[in-house]
Protein backbone atom coordinates (compact mmCIF):
# COMPACT_ATOMS: atom_id res chain seq x y z
CA UNK A 1 0.00 0.00 0.00
CA UNK A 2 1.33 3.43 -0.94
CA UNK A 3 2.10 6.11 1.62
CA UNK A 4 -0.37 8.93 2.21
CA UNK A 5 0.95 12.30 1.05
CA UNK A 6 -0.55 14.98 3.31
CA UNK A 7 -1.75 18.13 1.53
CA UNK A 8 -1.34 21.22 3.71
CA UNK A 9 -3.04 24.21 2.10
CA UNK A 10 -1.90 27.69 3.13
CA UNK A 11 -3.96 29.76 0.68
CA UNK A 12 -5.69 31.51 3.58
CA UNK A 13 -2.42 32.40 5.30
CA UNK A 14 0.58 32.56 2.98
CA UNK A 15 -1.57 33.06 -0.11
CA UNK A 16 -3.35 36.01 1.47
CA UNK A 17 0.00 37.73 2.00
CA UNK A 18 0.21 38.36 -1.74
CA UNK A 19 -0.27 42.15 -2.13
CA UNK A 20 -3.95 42.86 -2.79
CA UNK A 21 -5.16 39.39 -1.82
CA UNK A 22 -6.60 40.40 1.55
CA UNK A 23 -9.81 38.47 2.27
CA UNK A 24 -12.75 39.02 4.58
CA UNK A 25 -13.79 36.43 7.15
CA UNK A 26 -16.70 35.27 4.99
CA UNK A 27 -14.46 34.93 1.94
CA UNK A 28 -12.06 32.81 3.95
CA UNK A 29 -14.93 30.64 5.14
CA UNK A 30 -16.06 30.05 1.56
CA UNK A 31 -12.59 28.95 0.55
CA UNK A 32 -12.15 26.80 3.67
CA UNK A 33 -15.39 24.96 2.94
CA UNK A 34 -14.24 24.32 -0.63
CA UNK A 35 -10.89 23.01 0.65
CA UNK A 36 -12.77 20.66 2.98
CA UNK A 37 -14.94 19.55 0.07
CA UNK A 38 -11.73 18.85 -1.86
CA UNK A 39 -10.53 16.71 1.08
CA UNK A 40 -7.48 18.81 1.90
CA UNK A 41 -5.82 17.29 4.97
CA UNK A 42 -4.71 20.49 6.72
CA UNK A 43 -6.03 24.03 6.25
CA UNK A 44 -3.73 26.75 7.57
CA UNK A 45 -6.46 29.26 8.34
CA UNK A 46 -4.31 32.23 9.29
CA UNK A 47 -1.98 33.88 11.77
CA UNK A 48 -4.19 34.57 14.83
CA UNK A 49 -1.76 36.92 16.58
CA UNK A 50 -1.57 39.23 13.56
CA UNK A 51 -4.86 41.00 14.31
CA UNK A 52 -8.28 40.55 15.85
CA UNK A 53 -9.61 40.02 12.34
CA UNK A 54 -7.21 37.15 11.70
CA UNK A 55 -8.04 35.62 15.08
CA UNK A 56 -11.78 35.74 14.38
CA UNK A 57 -11.30 34.27 10.90
CA UNK A 58 -9.28 31.32 12.22
CA UNK A 59 -11.78 30.72 15.01
CA UNK A 60 -14.75 30.85 12.61
CA UNK A 61 -13.06 28.32 10.33
CA UNK A 62 -12.24 26.10 13.33
CA UNK A 63 -15.93 26.15 14.28
CA UNK A 64 -17.14 25.40 10.74
CA UNK A 65 -14.72 22.75 9.47
CA UNK A 66 -15.19 19.19 10.72
CA UNK A 67 -13.19 16.94 8.36
CA UNK A 68 -9.91 18.79 7.73
CA UNK A 69 -7.39 19.75 10.40
CA UNK A 70 -7.49 23.51 11.07
CA UNK A 71 -4.08 25.05 11.71
CA UNK A 72 -3.03 28.39 13.19
CA UNK A 73 0.43 29.88 12.66
CA UNK A 74 2.47 31.31 15.54
CA UNK A 75 5.93 32.64 16.06
CA UNK A 76 7.95 30.82 18.72
CA UNK A 77 6.80 33.06 21.55
CA UNK A 78 4.24 32.50 24.28
CA UNK A 79 1.82 35.27 23.30
CA UNK A 80 1.54 34.11 19.68
CA UNK A 81 1.12 30.46 20.65
CA UNK A 82 -1.57 31.16 23.22
CA UNK A 83 -3.46 33.25 20.69
CA UNK A 84 -3.24 30.43 18.14
CA UNK A 85 -4.34 27.88 20.74
CA UNK A 86 -7.42 29.93 21.60
CA UNK A 87 -8.28 30.38 17.92
CA UNK A 88 -8.17 26.67 17.05
CA UNK A 89 -9.89 25.56 20.27
CA UNK A 90 -13.30 24.83 18.61
CA UNK A 91 -11.76 22.67 15.86
CA UNK A 92 -12.56 18.98 15.59
CA UNK A 93 -8.87 18.61 14.77
CA UNK A 94 -6.59 21.53 15.56
CA UNK A 95 -2.91 22.14 14.91
CA UNK A 96 -0.46 24.82 16.03
CA UNK A 97 2.29 25.62 13.54
CA UNK A 98 5.16 27.44 15.23
CA UNK A 99 8.36 28.67 13.64
CA UNK A 100 11.68 30.39 14.24
CA UNK A 101 14.46 31.37 11.84
CA UNK A 102 17.53 29.11 11.63
CA UNK A 103 19.75 30.55 8.89
CA UNK A 104 22.89 32.41 10.04
CA UNK A 105 21.76 35.69 8.45
CA UNK A 106 18.32 35.53 10.09
CA UNK A 107 19.63 34.57 13.53
CA UNK A 108 22.24 37.33 13.47
CA UNK A 109 20.48 40.18 11.66
CA UNK A 110 16.79 39.64 12.51
CA UNK A 111 16.54 37.67 15.75
CA UNK A 112 19.79 38.91 17.34
CA UNK A 113 20.01 35.48 18.98
CA UNK A 114 22.73 32.86 19.22
CA UNK A 115 22.13 29.34 17.88
CA UNK A 116 21.85 28.06 21.47
CA UNK A 117 19.18 30.64 22.25
CA UNK A 118 17.24 29.73 19.11
CA UNK A 119 17.17 26.04 20.07
CA UNK A 120 16.06 26.88 23.61
CA UNK A 121 13.28 29.15 22.32
CA UNK A 122 12.06 26.49 19.88
CA UNK A 123 11.83 23.89 22.65
CA UNK A 124 9.93 26.33 24.89
CA UNK A 125 7.51 27.01 22.02
CA UNK A 126 6.69 23.31 21.70
CA UNK A 127 5.98 23.19 25.43
CA UNK A 128 3.54 26.10 25.23
CA UNK A 129 1.79 24.58 22.20
CA UNK A 130 1.34 21.23 23.98
CA UNK A 131 -0.99 22.97 26.44
CA UNK A 132 -3.51 23.29 23.59
CA UNK A 133 -2.97 20.34 21.24
CA UNK A 134 -0.79 17.31 20.57
CA UNK A 135 -0.71 18.15 16.85
CA UNK A 136 2.27 20.51 16.66
CA UNK A 137 4.23 21.47 13.58
CA UNK A 138 7.63 23.13 13.79
CA UNK A 139 9.19 25.11 10.94
CA UNK A 140 12.77 26.26 10.59
CA UNK A 141 12.33 29.55 8.77
CA UNK A 142 14.80 29.93 5.88
CA UNK A 143 15.87 26.30 6.22
CA UNK A 144 16.97 26.43 2.59
CA UNK A 145 19.90 28.65 3.61
CA UNK A 146 20.52 27.09 7.02
CA UNK A 147 23.50 24.95 7.99
CA UNK A 148 22.62 21.26 7.88
CA UNK A 149 24.31 20.48 11.21
CA UNK A 150 22.27 23.15 12.98
CA UNK A 151 19.05 21.93 11.36
CA UNK A 152 19.79 18.42 12.65
CA UNK A 153 20.38 19.81 16.12
CA UNK A 154 17.22 21.93 16.37
CA UNK A 155 15.00 19.28 14.78
CA UNK A 156 16.26 16.64 17.23
CA UNK A 157 15.44 19.00 20.11
CA UNK A 158 11.88 19.84 19.00
CA UNK A 159 11.10 16.20 18.21
CA UNK A 160 12.12 15.27 21.76
CA UNK A 161 9.96 18.15 23.02
CA UNK A 162 6.87 16.81 21.22
CA UNK A 163 6.68 18.18 17.66
CA UNK A 164 4.81 15.80 15.33
CA UNK A 165 5.54 17.46 11.97
CA UNK A 166 8.88 18.94 10.91
CA UNK A 167 8.71 21.50 8.11
CA UNK A 168 11.76 22.44 6.04
CA UNK A 169 10.78 25.61 4.14
CA UNK A 170 12.67 27.07 1.20
CA UNK A 171 11.55 30.51 2.31
CA UNK A 172 13.20 32.56 -0.44
CA UNK A 173 12.92 29.99 -3.27
CA UNK A 174 16.70 29.59 -3.43
CA UNK A 175 17.06 25.81 -3.73
CA UNK A 176 17.16 23.60 -6.82
CA UNK A 177 15.54 20.13 -6.84
CA UNK A 178 18.64 17.94 -6.46
CA UNK A 179 20.01 20.11 -3.66
CA UNK A 180 16.67 20.28 -1.82
CA UNK A 181 16.12 16.52 -2.10
CA UNK A 182 19.62 15.94 -0.70
CA UNK A 183 18.79 18.18 2.28
CA UNK A 184 15.57 16.28 3.05
CA UNK A 185 17.24 12.90 2.63
CA UNK A 186 20.14 13.91 4.87
CA UNK A 187 17.84 15.19 7.62
CA UNK A 188 15.77 12.00 7.62
CA UNK A 189 18.94 9.91 7.82
CA UNK A 190 20.72 11.95 10.50
CA UNK A 191 18.08 13.32 12.88
CA UNK A 192 17.33 11.00 15.83
CA UNK A 193 13.61 10.25 15.97
CA UNK A 194 13.10 11.15 12.29
CA UNK A 195 10.93 8.06 11.83
CA UNK A 196 8.50 9.31 14.48
CA UNK A 197 7.48 12.51 12.66
CA UNK A 198 6.08 13.62 9.32
CA UNK A 199 8.59 15.52 7.19
CA UNK A 200 7.08 18.50 5.42
CA UNK A 201 8.21 20.93 2.72
CA UNK A 202 7.12 24.49 1.96
CA UNK A 203 8.57 25.90 -1.26
CA UNK A 204 8.45 29.37 -2.78
CA UNK A 205 8.58 30.02 -6.50
CA UNK A 206 11.19 32.77 -6.84
CA UNK A 207 13.14 30.71 -9.40
CA UNK A 208 10.07 28.94 -10.78
CA UNK A 209 11.03 25.74 -8.96
CA UNK A 210 8.50 25.49 -6.11
CA UNK A 211 6.64 22.48 -7.52
CA UNK A 212 9.81 20.79 -8.79
CA UNK A 213 11.51 21.22 -5.41
CA UNK A 214 8.45 19.90 -3.56
CA UNK A 215 8.23 16.82 -5.78
CA UNK A 216 11.95 16.15 -5.42
CA UNK A 217 11.52 16.32 -1.64
CA UNK A 218 8.64 13.84 -1.81
CA UNK A 219 10.88 11.42 -3.66
CA UNK A 220 13.45 11.94 -0.88
CA UNK A 221 10.97 11.05 1.86
CA UNK A 222 8.84 14.11 2.63
CA UNK A 223 5.22 13.16 3.27
CA UNK A 224 3.58 16.56 3.61
CA UNK A 225 3.56 19.28 0.95
CA UNK A 226 2.57 22.85 1.81
CA UNK A 227 0.96 24.67 -1.09
CA UNK A 228 -1.66 27.15 -2.26
CA UNK A 229 -4.40 27.16 -4.88
CA UNK A 230 -3.22 28.75 -8.14
CA UNK A 231 0.24 29.07 -6.56
CA UNK A 232 -0.96 32.23 -4.82
CA UNK A 233 1.56 33.82 -2.49
CA UNK A 234 4.11 36.52 -1.82
CA UNK A 235 6.58 37.56 -4.50
CA UNK A 236 6.47 34.80 -7.16
CA UNK A 237 4.08 32.67 -5.11
CA UNK A 238 4.05 29.22 -3.53
CA UNK A 239 3.97 25.68 -4.85
CA UNK A 240 0.63 25.22 -6.65
CA UNK A 241 -1.66 22.65 -5.02
CA UNK A 242 -3.23 21.62 -8.31
CA UNK A 243 0.14 20.93 -9.95
CA UNK A 244 1.49 18.92 -7.01
CA UNK A 245 -1.63 16.80 -6.67
CA UNK A 246 -1.96 16.00 -10.36
CA UNK A 247 1.77 15.37 -10.86
CA UNK A 248 1.72 12.77 -8.10
CA UNK A 249 -1.54 11.24 -9.31
CA UNK A 250 -0.61 11.18 -12.99
CA UNK A 251 2.82 9.66 -12.32
CA UNK A 252 1.93 6.89 -9.91
CA UNK A 253 4.56 4.84 -11.71
CA UNK A 254 7.17 7.16 -10.19
CA UNK A 255 5.87 8.42 -6.85
CA UNK A 256 5.64 6.08 -3.84
CA UNK A 257 2.63 7.92 -2.40
CA UNK A 258 -0.70 9.54 -3.28
CA UNK A 259 -3.06 12.15 -1.85
CA UNK A 260 -6.71 11.78 -0.85
CA UNK A 261 -7.70 14.92 -2.77
CA UNK A 262 -10.97 14.89 -4.75
CA UNK A 263 -9.44 16.24 -7.95
CA UNK A 264 -12.83 17.05 -9.50
CA UNK A 265 -13.02 19.96 -7.03
CA UNK A 266 -9.74 21.53 -8.19
CA UNK A 267 -11.09 23.78 -10.96
CA UNK A 268 -14.06 25.02 -8.87
CA UNK A 269 -11.62 25.82 -6.05
CA UNK A 270 -9.27 27.61 -8.43
CA UNK A 271 -12.11 29.75 -9.80
CA UNK A 272 -13.32 30.57 -6.30
CA UNK A 273 -9.89 31.77 -5.17
CA UNK A 274 -9.42 33.76 -8.37
CA UNK A 275 -12.82 35.40 -7.94
CA UNK A 276 -12.34 36.21 -4.26
CA UNK A 277 -8.84 37.63 -4.61
CA UNK A 278 -9.23 39.25 -8.03
CA UNK A 279 -6.09 37.49 -9.26
CA UNK A 280 -6.92 36.00 -12.69
CA UNK A 281 -5.50 32.61 -13.66
CA UNK A 282 -3.21 32.85 -16.69
CA UNK A 283 -4.70 30.95 -19.67
CA UNK A 284 -1.70 28.62 -20.03
CA UNK A 285 -1.53 27.76 -16.31
CA UNK A 286 -1.13 24.01 -15.83
CA UNK A 287 -4.30 22.15 -14.79
CA UNK A 288 -6.52 25.19 -14.12
CA UNK A 289 -5.73 27.57 -17.00
CA UNK A 290 -8.40 28.04 -19.68
CA UNK A 291 -6.03 26.61 -22.31
CA UNK A 292 -4.75 23.71 -20.20
CA UNK A 293 -6.71 21.18 -22.26
CA UNK A 294 -7.05 23.16 -25.52
CA UNK A 295 -5.49 21.85 -28.73
CA UNK A 296 -4.89 24.38 -31.52
CA UNK A 297 -2.53 22.41 -33.75
CA UNK A 298 -4.27 20.42 -36.48
CA UNK A 299 -1.94 17.49 -35.89
CA UNK A 300 -2.75 17.51 -32.18
CA UNK A 301 -6.48 17.89 -32.82
CA UNK A 302 -6.44 14.94 -35.21
CA UNK A 303 -4.62 12.80 -32.67
CA UNK A 304 -6.97 13.70 -29.83
CA UNK A 305 -10.03 12.99 -31.96
CA UNK A 306 -8.67 9.56 -32.88
CA UNK A 307 -7.46 8.70 -29.38
CA UNK A 308 -7.35 11.34 -26.66
CA UNK A 309 -4.34 9.81 -24.90
CA UNK A 310 -2.15 10.67 -27.89
CA UNK A 311 -1.79 14.21 -26.52
CA UNK A 312 -3.63 14.24 -23.17
CA UNK A 313 -2.02 12.78 -20.07
CA UNK A 314 -5.10 13.43 -17.92
CA UNK A 315 -8.77 14.12 -18.55
CA UNK A 316 -10.18 17.62 -18.19
CA UNK A 317 -13.25 16.32 -16.38
CA UNK A 318 -11.04 14.61 -13.77
CA UNK A 319 -9.96 18.01 -12.42
CA UNK A 320 -13.39 19.64 -12.64
CA UNK A 321 -13.56 21.12 -16.13
CA UNK A 322 -16.87 20.88 -17.97
CA UNK A 323 -18.95 20.60 -14.82
CA UNK A 324 -20.65 24.00 -15.11
CA UNK A 325 -24.32 24.01 -16.02
CA UNK A 326 -27.41 26.21 -16.05
CA UNK A 327 -28.61 26.24 -12.47
CA UNK A 328 -31.18 28.97 -11.91
CA UNK A 329 -33.46 31.38 -13.73
CA UNK A 330 -35.89 34.23 -13.16
CA UNK A 331 -38.54 31.89 -11.73
CA UNK A 332 -36.22 30.28 -9.17
CA UNK A 333 -37.17 30.85 -5.56
CA UNK A 334 -35.30 31.83 -2.44
CA UNK A 335 -34.83 28.24 -1.21
CA UNK A 336 -33.44 27.13 -4.56
CA UNK A 337 -31.03 30.06 -4.46
CA UNK A 338 -29.94 29.19 -0.91
CA UNK A 339 -29.45 25.55 -1.88
CA UNK A 340 -27.31 26.44 -4.88
CA UNK A 341 -25.16 28.77 -2.79
CA UNK A 342 -24.49 25.90 -0.39
CA UNK A 343 -23.65 23.53 -3.24
CA UNK A 344 -20.95 25.84 -4.60
CA UNK A 345 -19.52 26.53 -1.16
CA UNK A 346 -20.99 29.95 -0.37
CA UNK A 347 -22.22 30.55 3.18
CA UNK A 348 -24.06 33.78 3.93
CA UNK A 349 -23.63 35.54 7.25
CA UNK A 350 -27.32 35.97 8.11
CA UNK A 351 -30.87 35.90 6.81
CA UNK A 352 -30.56 39.63 6.15
CA UNK A 353 -27.50 38.99 4.04
CA UNK A 354 -29.28 36.18 2.18
CA UNK A 355 -32.26 38.43 1.46
CA UNK A 356 -29.98 41.12 0.06
CA UNK A 357 -28.10 38.62 -2.10
CA UNK A 358 -31.36 37.08 -3.36
CA UNK A 359 -32.66 40.52 -4.34
CA UNK A 360 -29.45 41.03 -6.33
CA UNK A 361 -29.96 37.63 -7.96
CA UNK A 362 -33.52 38.49 -9.03
CA UNK A 363 -32.27 41.75 -10.54
CA UNK A 364 -29.70 39.77 -12.50
CA UNK A 365 -32.29 37.20 -13.59
CA UNK A 366 -34.39 39.98 -15.11
CA UNK A 367 -31.42 41.06 -17.24
CA UNK A 368 -29.85 37.70 -18.06
CA UNK A 369 -31.78 34.70 -19.38
CA UNK A 370 -29.29 32.00 -18.41
CA UNK A 371 -27.53 32.08 -15.05
CA UNK A 372 -24.48 29.89 -14.42
CA UNK A 373 -22.43 29.08 -11.32
CA UNK A 374 -19.85 31.65 -12.41
CA UNK A 375 -22.57 34.32 -12.46
CA UNK A 376 -23.60 33.49 -8.90
CA UNK A 377 -20.00 33.44 -7.67
CA UNK A 378 -19.35 36.80 -9.30
CA UNK A 379 -22.56 38.25 -7.89
CA UNK A 380 -21.54 37.10 -4.42
CA UNK A 381 -17.96 38.36 -4.72
CA UNK A 382 -19.13 41.88 -3.86
CA UNK A 383 -21.70 40.58 -1.36
CA UNK A 384 -19.22 38.88 0.98
CA UNK A 385 -18.71 42.03 3.05
CA UNK A 386 -21.20 41.44 5.84
CA UNK A 387 -23.79 44.17 6.50
CA UNK A 388 -21.97 45.52 9.57
CA UNK A 389 -18.83 45.95 7.43
CA UNK A 390 -20.62 47.52 4.46
CA UNK A 391 -19.81 51.17 4.98
CA UNK A 392 -20.36 52.11 1.32
CA UNK A 393 -23.06 50.72 -0.99
CA UNK A 394 -24.28 51.77 -4.41
CA UNK A 395 -28.00 52.59 -4.28
CA UNK A 396 -28.60 54.17 -7.69
CA UNK A 397 -26.60 55.43 -10.64
CA UNK A 398 -26.98 57.49 -13.78
CA UNK A 399 -24.27 58.11 -16.38
CA UNK A 400 -24.12 60.72 -19.15
CA UNK A 401 -21.70 60.19 -22.01
CA UNK A 402 -22.37 61.81 -25.37
CA UNK A 403 -19.96 62.50 -28.21
CA UNK A 404 -18.22 65.82 -27.68
CA UNK A 405 -19.40 66.22 -24.09
CA UNK A 406 -17.57 65.50 -20.84
CA UNK A 407 -18.84 62.25 -19.27
CA UNK A 408 -20.66 62.64 -15.97
CA UNK A 409 -21.69 60.25 -13.19
CA UNK A 410 -24.56 60.89 -10.76
CA UNK A 411 -24.54 58.37 -7.91
CA UNK A 412 -26.57 57.73 -4.81
CA UNK A 413 -24.50 55.98 -2.15
CA UNK A 414 -25.42 54.55 1.21
CA UNK A 415 -22.74 55.60 3.71
CA UNK A 416 -23.18 53.81 7.03
CA UNK A 417 -26.89 53.55 6.26
CA UNK A 418 -27.38 57.19 5.24
CA UNK A 419 -28.09 57.92 1.57
CA UNK A 420 -25.93 60.59 -0.04
CA UNK A 421 -25.91 61.93 -3.59
CA UNK A 422 -22.66 62.67 -5.40
CA UNK A 423 -21.70 63.74 -8.92
CA UNK A 424 -18.47 64.20 -10.86
CA UNK A 425 -17.13 64.55 -14.38
CA UNK A 426 -14.24 62.56 -15.79
CA UNK A 427 -12.31 61.57 -18.88
CA UNK A 428 -14.72 58.66 -19.28
CA UNK A 429 -17.76 57.27 -17.45
CA UNK A 430 -15.64 54.97 -15.27
CA UNK A 431 -13.32 57.83 -14.31
CA UNK A 432 -16.36 59.99 -13.54
CA UNK A 433 -17.87 57.26 -11.34
CA UNK A 434 -14.64 56.83 -9.39
CA UNK A 435 -14.29 60.58 -8.88
CA UNK A 436 -17.88 60.80 -7.66
CA UNK A 437 -17.16 58.08 -5.10
CA UNK A 438 -13.93 59.81 -4.03
CA UNK A 439 -15.91 62.99 -3.41
CA UNK A 440 -17.68 61.12 -0.61
CA UNK A 441 -14.99 58.69 0.57
CA UNK A 442 -12.12 61.16 0.37
CA UNK A 443 -8.92 61.16 -1.63
CA UNK A 444 -5.61 59.54 -0.72
CA UNK A 445 -6.44 56.24 -2.40
CA UNK A 446 -4.31 55.13 -5.34
CA UNK A 447 -5.77 52.97 -8.11
CA UNK A 448 -3.17 50.32 -8.96
CA UNK A 449 -5.20 48.01 -11.19
CA UNK A 450 -8.40 48.07 -13.22
CA UNK A 451 -9.41 45.02 -15.24
CA UNK A 452 -12.59 43.70 -16.86
CA UNK A 453 -13.46 40.10 -17.72
CA UNK A 454 -16.58 38.57 -19.25
CA UNK A 455 -17.86 35.94 -16.83
CA UNK A 456 -19.67 33.81 -19.42
CA UNK A 457 -20.35 33.96 -23.14
CA UNK A 458 -23.11 35.90 -24.89
CA UNK A 459 -24.01 39.54 -25.32
CA UNK A 460 -25.92 39.48 -22.02
CA UNK A 461 -22.89 38.20 -20.10
CA UNK A 462 -21.96 39.89 -16.87
CA UNK A 463 -18.75 41.83 -16.78
CA UNK A 464 -16.61 41.29 -13.71
CA UNK A 465 -14.42 44.24 -12.77
CA UNK A 466 -11.43 44.01 -10.46
CA UNK A 467 -9.79 47.09 -8.96
CA UNK A 468 -6.73 47.23 -6.74
CA UNK A 469 -6.52 50.15 -4.34
CA UNK A 470 -3.68 51.29 -2.10
CA UNK A 471 -3.82 53.60 0.86
CA UNK A 472 -0.69 54.06 2.95
CA UNK A 473 0.71 50.53 3.37
CA UNK A 474 -2.58 48.74 2.72
CA UNK A 475 -3.39 47.14 -0.64
CA UNK A 476 -6.72 45.45 -1.39
CA UNK A 477 -8.60 44.08 -4.36
CA UNK A 478 -12.29 44.76 -4.93
CA UNK A 479 -14.68 43.00 -7.28
CA UNK A 480 -17.99 43.97 -8.80
CA UNK A 481 -20.18 42.28 -11.40
CA UNK A 482 -23.05 43.55 -13.51
CA UNK A 483 -24.34 43.40 -17.06
CA UNK A 484 -23.48 47.12 -17.14
CA UNK A 485 -19.69 47.53 -17.00
CA UNK A 486 -19.87 51.05 -15.54
CA UNK A 487 -22.08 49.86 -12.68
CA UNK A 488 -19.76 46.87 -12.15
CA UNK A 489 -16.83 49.29 -11.96
CA UNK A 490 -18.52 51.40 -9.30
CA UNK A 491 -19.39 48.29 -7.29
CA UNK A 492 -15.80 47.05 -7.49
CA UNK A 493 -14.43 50.39 -6.29
CA UNK A 494 -16.86 50.45 -3.36
CA UNK A 495 -16.07 46.82 -2.53
CA UNK A 496 -12.39 47.69 -2.31
CA UNK A 497 -13.12 50.75 -0.17
CA UNK A 498 -15.12 48.59 2.24
CA UNK A 499 -12.16 46.23 2.57
CA UNK A 500 -9.78 49.13 3.13
CA UNK A 501 -12.10 50.55 5.76
CA UNK A 502 -12.29 47.32 7.75
CA UNK A 503 -8.80 45.96 7.16
CA UNK A 504 -6.67 45.90 10.28
CA UNK A 505 -2.91 46.11 10.43
CA UNK A 506 -1.53 42.60 10.33
CA UNK A 507 1.86 40.99 10.59
CA UNK A 508 3.07 38.99 7.60
CA UNK A 509 5.36 36.16 8.72
CA UNK A 510 7.74 34.68 6.16
CA UNK A 511 8.01 30.92 5.73
UniProtKB/Swiss-Prot annotation:
One of its GO terms (cellular component) is cytosol. Residues 5-267 form the Pyruvate carboxyltransferase domain. Its EC number is 2.3.3.13. Mn(2+) binds at residues 14, 202, 204, 238. Gene3D superfamilies: 1.10.238.260, 3.30.160.270, Aldolase class I. Pathway: Amino-acid biosynthesis; L-leucine biosynthesis; L-leucine from 3-methyl-2-oxobutanoate: step 1/4. This is 2-isopropylmalate synthase. Catalyzes the condensation of the acetyl group of acetyl-CoA with 3-methyl-2-oxobutanoate (2-ketoisovalerate) to form 3-carboxy-3-hydroxy-4-methylpentanoate (2-isopropylmalate). Keywords: Amino-acid biosynthesis, Branched-chain amino acid biosynthesis, Cytoplasm, Leucine biosynthesis, Manganese, Metal-binding, Transferase. The gene is leuA. Belongs to the alpha-IPM synthase/homocitrate synthase family. LeuA type 1 subfamily. One of its GO terms (biological process) is L-leucine biosynthetic process. It is found in: Cytoplasm. It is an enzyme of class 2 (transferase). It comes from Aromatoleum aromaticum (strain DSM 19018 / LMG 30748 / EbN1). Residues 393-511 are annotated as: Regulatory domain. NCBIfam families: leuA_bact, PRK00915.1-3, PRK00915.1-4. CDD domains: DRE_TIM_IPMS (cd07940). It holds the Pfam family LeuA_dimer. Homodimer. Its main location: cytoplasm. Coiled coil: none annotated.
Amino acid sequence: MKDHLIVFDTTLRDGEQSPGASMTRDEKLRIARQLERMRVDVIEAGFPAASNGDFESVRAIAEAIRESTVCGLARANEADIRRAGEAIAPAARGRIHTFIATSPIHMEMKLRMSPDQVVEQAVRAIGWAKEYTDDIEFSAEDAGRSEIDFLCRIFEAVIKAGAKTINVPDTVGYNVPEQYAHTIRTLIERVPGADKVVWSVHCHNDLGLAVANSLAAVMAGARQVECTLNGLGERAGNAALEELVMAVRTRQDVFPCDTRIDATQIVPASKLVSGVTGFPVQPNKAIVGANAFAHESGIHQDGVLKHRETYEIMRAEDVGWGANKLVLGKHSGRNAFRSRLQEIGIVVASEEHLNHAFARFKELADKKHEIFDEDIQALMSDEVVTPDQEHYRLVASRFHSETGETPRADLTLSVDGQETRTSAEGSGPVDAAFKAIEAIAGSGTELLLYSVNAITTGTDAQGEVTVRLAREDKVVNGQGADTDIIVASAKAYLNALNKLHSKLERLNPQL
